[in-house]
């Protein structure tokens, strides 16, 4: 083991005869902004799913802050400080913006909030949960929309809310799966500014197809193709790697 906040060792995921993730070794350091790129079908989202517990790997190990979490369910990984946003917006559309954030905040105050009916009590009975919720709403600039249903928000604001939901769990590491997908250039800039602002003190692992954006924000980049690590290094090193250029320009697909 190293001092990495996240480490995968030989992580492999097979679906029948298809190997979607193939012996991936990955180490994300504390405070690092790491990006994972690769052609469509390279195994990026499957890798995220194995790290977050949405899928169990066929082989290999996932370590988080020195603990083997390979077999832990997703909610236990969240409690340990691992957060994730999804490629497709993942909010409770019928609930108010405040309630979306509050439900996430409850996960880090769970010992204070005992009982099966906790989520239905008045928010003022939660003490720290209510204060934490309001703080998150302020940080993501959605306090003025707190009592609106999430489904009424503009798309960019729904993505902003999703980042707030992740932030509310107070994660040490955040996995961001194409957080700017479907956005205009202006929305993309605003979303990345928000991420770099409110998540600046966390370790970040990003999947993103906008290569210019990746080159701008990343400390290091890992390139996947056919489920394997093709290259890893600084943005300058990746930009100058012939194998990486061939993988993209050569149209490698699965």
Segments predicted by a language model, with ranges:
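Conserved ABC transporter NBD signature motif
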Residues: 60-67, 79-80
